[in-house]
Amino acid sequence: QERKIEELTKQLAVVKTAASGKTQKERARRSESVSAMMNWNEAQTRCLIDEQLRLSGWEADTQNLRYSKGTRPVKGRNIAISEWSTNSAFYKNGYADYAFFVGEKLVALMDAKKMSEDVASTIDVQVKDYAAHIKPEDIPHTVGNWNGYQVPFLFASNGRAYLEQLRTKSGIWFLDVREQENQPYPIRNWFSPSDLMEKLGQNTVAANQALAAADNSFMTDPNGLNLRDYQIKAIDKATEAIVDGKRTALLAMATGTGKTRTVLGLIYKMLESKRFRRILFLVDRVSLGEQAMDTFKDVKLKELLTLDKIYEIKAIDDNIINLETKVSISTVQGLLKRTILAEEPDLMPGAFDLIIVDEAHRGYILDREMTEEEILYDNQDDYMSKYKQVIEYFDAVKVALTATPALHTTEIFGEPVYTYSYREAVIDGWLVDHDPPYLINTDFIENDAQFKKGETLAQYDPNTNELLNGAVLDDEMDFDVSEFNRKIVLPDHTHKVLEEVSTYLNPESGEKTLIFAVNDAHADRIVDTLREIYKPYGISNDAIMKITGKTAGGNKKKILQVIKQFKNNQYPNIAVTVDLLTTGIDVPAICNLVFMRKINSRILFEQMLGRATRLCPEIGKTHRSEERRVGKE
């Protein structure tokens, strides 16, 4: 693992040096290039915009596809015609820098600015004036009239990529003039022709009215969704926020209170009212996406039909989005590769108009064993920056669900519009309470994790898995508990702890146990030690299993199969994990949690605790138990 991290770090350094210019000469050249671009005039900026438009599916060539050169809309072609003439008196020429035609339909106008100029207010006067003064001979190309505006969609751009710190000076500013209360706002990339046509076919006012008056009886059908009161309230609060015109809504619901079924009810309600065209269900792990898809295929909603039989759903391994697609399930990492990290994104900002974010507390990677993908980010701030970018890339309303709201969560989604806490759920009888934790200490922990001067310690090489010749300590060495099994390996210590833990567990019972390890190697040692401890009692090896991202050689399908086995079968009864099972996994029979690591993140810790809160009447579960081996508390 350490060697792999080192190799990836070196690769990352090379990539970043090439991309951003680490040497003084490269930085100077880059600075000169940026300075030169800031001095570009409008004509030069339009050449840059041409390329951006072509990547989004438009024919664009500011020099040749020009009104004055005879370019006109053509059936079957999507052309951004430059310098389109209008009767506007804003300038003596009266032309818009670009007019967007889908076939022969005029759907949008755009004004380009020099890269150094602000663009935020350009739409307010200039582009609106163009839209209100279309020439009489061009009226047949228009698709409606809205409060005097003959073109529905307006843009302004100076060619610069969007930066939050330079909000008014960057991005592509967009306004839908069909509703008077709409305000201009920046988007990250150009809409494709199909994006604009889908927007054009949507009546948000009528859809909001339908949404507010929607029949919720399907939510309480005992043979179908069968939602609880608090789940219905959560959907109602999200609906109110959407009808009120809010672009974000955060639902804070305790782990184990049925967020996935709540999401299913929300999705179905939104699609039935036609409020949204296409919904993205965003998860941060493949296993969570698979679990959601299972629910979508299992729960009956209307006339004994499940969601996947009523609407087209794209599973987590299906990237092809078409006009019929209504729901797509994807991971954050997958979307990053298809949008902001892609040279040529295959998803435009209009691909989804509602994003539902599962487990929106995401962002505790510093306290986790990072995946190879995560190692390629500079740090937690860099990861969260890209997480936010991919969520905000789409021109969509965002509804997020989390059990553990944190600062970075509310910064993106705002304060919760609805909260249903763990304590409320316990009082209402929907979750189980927990016993006081058992604290297990050893002499080594009690003695402050200290090695004495003169002791001989074997050195472990993680790259070769070999123990090297012992070294005599020249001085005392102290270790923090968080470094156990990360920097120091103590087999005797681990064995003593697990011997004590084993007295509380019965691998042959219906009560399942989840043990949290420091890393994958530590998980292997725990499994091996427990099997050794239980061997004299005739316990099957299958009763104890490691379930991490490296199980079955990292084969995702096999990992999902093992997770389902843990949930549905007698064995494994004891699962040892690192981070794979910390969030979102629904195994009601988990009764015991064992912490063989120090947890530095409140968010992660609460998510871990949530693995054992679900009701499981089949085994008579009334509470959860915890064994913590984290040293002095």
Q: Which residues are covered by each model-predicted region?
A:
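ATP-dependent helicase/translocase motor core
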Residues: 1-278, 287, 291-303, 324-327, ...
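Conserved RecA-like ASCE ATPase "motif II neighborhood" in helicase/translocase motors
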Residues: 327-386, 563, 577-578
